Amino acid sequence: MADTPVSAPVVPEVTERKSKRGTKAAAVKVPKEKKKVIAAKKPKSKGTSSHPSFFEMISDAISTLKERTGSSQYAINKFVEDKHKQLPSNFRKLLLFHLKKLVASGKLVKVKNSFKLPSARAAPAPALAKKPTIPKPKVAAKPKTAKIGAKPKAKAKVAAKTKATTKTVAKKIPAAKPKAKTAGKPKTVAAKPAKVAKTAAVASPGKKKAVPVKKVKTVKSPAGKRTRK
C-alpha cells in the first residue's frame, strides 16, 4: 500500500518541463525574424543623395568657369566642393570615374588634361539631319505611280512582239501558196498574147495597102475639075 502514493506525483513534473522548453524555443525564434526585416529597410534610407548628378555638377562647373582650353579636373573638383558641401568622402575618386565615363559616351570632350562640353553647333546638326529622314518614306509613295505608269510600256512591248509574230506568220503563209499554183499560170497567159499579137501584125498590113488607094482617087478628082474651069 505504501508504494502506490510515491509513483503518482512523478508524471506531472515531466510534462511541465517539456512545456517550458517549448515556450522558450518559441520566444527565441520571434526576435530573429524582426532583425531580418529591420536589416532590409536600412539600405533604402542610405540611397538618397543631397547633391545632383555628377553630369549636372561637372557641366555646371565647365559652363561657369568658361575656360578656352577647358577646365581641369582640379578646377572642377574645387568648384563642386565649394558649391555642394554635402558630398561623399570618396568624391574625388567618383569624379574621376564619371569624367572618364562621360568622355567615353561623348557627353564631354577631353583636350590634353582638361575637359570641355561638346560644341553647340555640333549638337543641333544631327537633329536637323534626322528631320528630313521622316518625310522621305512618305515621299517614297509617289514613285509607285510612276511604276504603275511604266506598266503600259511593258504591255506595249508585248503588243509589239505579238504584232511582229503575226506579221511573220502572215508572211510565211502566203509565201507557201504561190510556189505551187502560180508557177504554171503565167506561162499560159504569156503564150496567148503572143499569138494575138502575131495575128494582128499579119492582118494590119493588108488593110493599110487597100486604104491609101481609095483615098487618093477621091481627093484628086475634084481638084482637077476646079482648076480646068
Swiss-Prot record:
Cross-referenced InterPro entries: H1/H5, Histone_H1/H5_H15, WH-like_DNA-bd_sf, WH_DNA-bd_sf
Keyword ATP-binding assigned: no
Region feature (Disordered): 1-52, 125-229
UniProt domain H15: residue ranges: 50-119
GO CC annotations on file: nucleosome; nucleus
Cysteine pairs bridged by disulfides in the record: none
Main location: nucleus
Residue ranges, compositional bias (Basic residues): 32-45, 139-160, 206-229
Keyword entries, A-Z: Chromosome, DNA-binding, Nucleus
Summary of the function given for this chain in its UniProt record: Histones H1 are necessary for the condensation of nucleosome chains into higher-order structures.
Homology family: Belongs to the histone H1/H5 family.
Protein name: Histone H1
Organism: Euphorbia esula
